[in-house]
Amino acid sequence: CAFGPRVPNTEAHRLCGTYIAEKFKSFGATVTDQYADVKAYDGTVLKARNIIASYNPDAKARILVCGHWDSRPWADNDPDSANWHKPVLAANDAASDVAVMLEMARLIQLHPLEIGIDFICFDAEDYGVPQWSDQAGDASSWCLGSQYWAANPHVYGYQARFGILMDMVGGRGSTFSKEGYSQRYASQVVDLVWNTAAQLGYGQFFPMRDGGYITDDHVPVNEIAGIPCIDIIPYFTDAPSGFGPTWHTVNDNMEHIDRQVLKAVGQTVIQVIYNENQ
């Protein structure tokens, strides 16, 4: 968050992308930058950068772990309309995803695996049609970086056993329901992750309840790339937004990050990975 909002086509975005790539390299990953010009809902051409950090790139058995790293350009869900055109710092949505992936990468460097791991930081996830726009909402206006990667993977014919997407995994008060598309396309992976969380004592963060269907980066991973992928995403039953009180507001900052939530998600996902390595 020290770089400021990571809005595509800005200097803060460019600098932060370089920082993320260099951190993965420092943890021993092979880093691939996938640059793409993607078109936003309003015709703006976004200079997108998907950052792929791989371990054991020659291993056939692979697991995909992903999240997005860009910031929402507009705080269009803010309770104060004066903030609707201001960019979002996006500590939870989704610097939290990248922070957890970087910590996993650090652990993998210390405790090497035999299976292959690909961390993907997707760009241009959060440039969807804003609520103040005259245009109708369009699901395809979101997740532009993952749509591009799913159609043009960094390795020809790329496959993975399964994928785990993390989105907003650090917000205070977060719990994670079983998201709809995840259950449709990858119910066994949902069960694997939720059962692992329960075994680790994190069942309060991963309740055994169904959530709604969320347009997120796992949808193109499932539908275009054909990789069964789940989404770990919060579901608030008692907030104005199901994604929590800071979603797409100027208050999505470090003050509202809970280390216990980050720990619950990170330890659960890394345990799933090491269990698959056995």
Residue ranges and their predicted role:
Residues Y35, F162, V169-Q278:
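Active-site-adjacent substrate-binding region
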Residues C1-P8, A21, K25-T32, E103-L113, ...:
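Sec-exported extracytoplasmic/periplasmic mature domains
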Residues R6-P8, D37-A40, P57-A59, W69-P73, ...:
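Solvent-exposed loop/turn segments at secondary-structure junctions
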Residues C1-R14, V38-D42, N83-A95, L107-I108, ...:
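Second-shell loop/turn segments in exported
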Residues A2-D58:
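A non-catalytic alpha/beta surface segment that caps or lines the substrate-entry region
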Residues E11-S26, V31, S96-E103, G116, ...:
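Extracytoplasmic/secreted proteins, especially bacterial periplasmic and envelope-associated proteins
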Residues T32-D33, I52-S54, R62-G67, A90, ...:
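Structural recognition of the beta-strand scaffold that forms the well-ordered cores
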Residues H85-Q188:
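Acidic/histidine-rich catalytic neighborhood of metal-dependent amide-processing enzymes
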